[in-house]
Structure formats: C-alpha cells, structure tokens
UniProtKB/Swiss-Prot annotation:
Signal peptide: none annotated. The lineage of its organism: Bacteria, Pseudomonadati, Pseudomonadota, Gammaproteobacteria, Enterobacterales. It comes from Escherichia coli O127:H6 (strain E2348/69 / EPEC). The keyword ATP-binding applies. It is an enzyme of class 2 (transferase). GO terms for molecular function: ATP binding; triphosphoribosyl-dephospho-CoA synthase activity. HAMAP family: CitG. PANTHER family: 2-(5''-TRIPHOSPHORIBOSYL)-3'-DEPHOSPHOCOENZYME-A SYNTHASE, TRIPHOSPHORIBOSYL-DEPHOSPHO-COA SYNTHASE. This is 2-(5''-triphosphoribosyl)-3'-dephosphocoenzyme-A synthase. InterPro entries: CitG (IPR002736), TriPribosyl-deP-CoA_syn_CitG (IPR017551). Gene3D superfamilies: Triphosphoribosyl-dephospho-CoA protein. It holds the Pfam family CitG. Belongs to the CitG/MdcB family. It catalyses: 3'-dephospho-CoA + ATP = 2'-(5''-triphospho-alpha-D-ribosyl)-3'-dephospho-CoA + adenine. GO terms for biological process: prosthetic group biosynthetic process.
Amino acid sequence: MSMPATSTKTTKLATSLIDEYALLGWRAMLTEVNLSPKPGLVDRINCGAHKDMALEDFHRSALAIQGWLPRFIEFGACSAEMAPEAVLNGLRPIGMACEGDMFRATAGVNTHKGSIFSLGLLCAAIGRLLQLNQPVTPTTVCSTAASFCRGLTDRELRTNNSRLTAGQRLYQQLGLTGARGEAEAGYPLVINHALPHYLTLLDQGLDPELALLDTLLLLMATNGDTNVASRGGEGGLRWLQREAQTLLQKGGIRTPADLDYLRQFDRECIERNLSPGGSADLLILTWFLAQI
C-alpha cells in the first residue's frame, strides 16, 4: 500500500500517536456495526434492509480502512501550512485509494464509503491540529474539518446538468445536503446533539451499548438521511424520523427490555427497505469523538 503523491512536507508527529488515532477510527467502525439491534442496519442479528452485505463484510472493510487512516492524519499534518480550503483536493486521492482497498476487501460491496469521507476528514483535521500544536477536542476537530469543506455543497450539489448524481437529485428535490452539508457545517448533529446526549447517558451510568442505541435513535429522528430518502423518498424519511422520535418520547432505550421496540422497528424498516446509513456514519463519528 503506497500513499498517493499528495504532499512533500514531512511531519513531526510520533508514529505511535498517529496509530493511536487510527486505531480509534477502526474501533469506532467496529463498535457501530456490532451494535445490536439496529433498525434497518447490518448488525450481529441480521443484515437489516441490505441483501448484498453481511457483518463480516464490515469487519473486513474496517480493517482495510484502518491501514489508510494514518495517511489522512499525515496529510493533515503535512498540509498544515496550506489554506484549509486547499486540503480537500489533496485528501481525495488518499480517499479514492482507501475506497479501492475497501472494495477489494468486500468483493465490491460498499460498506463504509461514507465513513472513509467523514473519518478521513476528521483524521486529517487531527493531523493539522497536532502539527500546529493546537488542542485536539471534538469541537476543534469538527471545525477544522468544516474549514476543509468550505463551499463543498455549492460546488458539488448545486450543479445544473442533465446527468445528476443521486446526491444532486436529493438536494434539488428535497433540499437534503447529506454528508457534504454535515461536514461543511462542522457536524452539528454530532457536536450539538448526539455527542452530548451520549456522554450524558454514560455519566448517568447507562450501559454503553444502550446509550449508543439511544443516541442512534436521536440521530435517526433528526438527520435528513439521504440513504433513507434514496430508498423511500421523502415519505420514507419522514416515517423513519417520526418512528424514532416516538420511541424517544416514550423513554428511549434505557433497559434491555426496551430492545424489543428496536427489534420491531428493525422489522418495519426491513419491510420498507429503509436503512439509515447516514445516521450510522454519524454514530461512528460520535463514538470516535467521545474517545478524544
């Protein structure tokens, strides 16, 4: 595995520190996929609304991606003197190479494409902050990632042409900005909602898995998930958001007995062919940021 020629400067970061953050990224991906039961998503119980992927695909994918996370951190450090808006172009070749390894590991199944984008951004932000001797906190990491993505939504979603991508169609039809919009805004759903919610539940002594499942419900209730909208349209997205909000209003996931509600929600998502993959990606970031 060779790193694309995207930078020439060297980094002063310790390899052990780089590997530590890369390991957290890998653990975040595994924590999310192993979390069960998750409505419509692949987990230890079933494949959710997916017929083309299984738990083992995600395990292989996460391992393949882990090998590339240090490259994102290194590029973030090496490009620390560049204008932040110029960093994204340098990250793209690394992301594409990482994506290639993911597809090879899964025999062509798209398991973690969204996480390559989001974790890649956060890892590059961490590298930049470390190189500049600035604090590495959830807020500084997300604001730095946002600076890399300035103007991204305008450039990539507001294009008018006859061959629209799925993301462009959802933006034009429903106003959903998806992963690009969340990144450009500095991951407000994570920073302002999911992360404080998760940490509060942990402080209250709730089991970590139950806390994560409840946090997933919060994300599903608030996120304009393009994965859901692409499968079920606006109606499918609004239904999923309402169902998640209803469960939260009933008390959320606080005891093992509450998992029955999630199992029923899972069955309904499978029947409707809905999978909140965008919210799953944000849950990965939530767990990752909770560790730093």
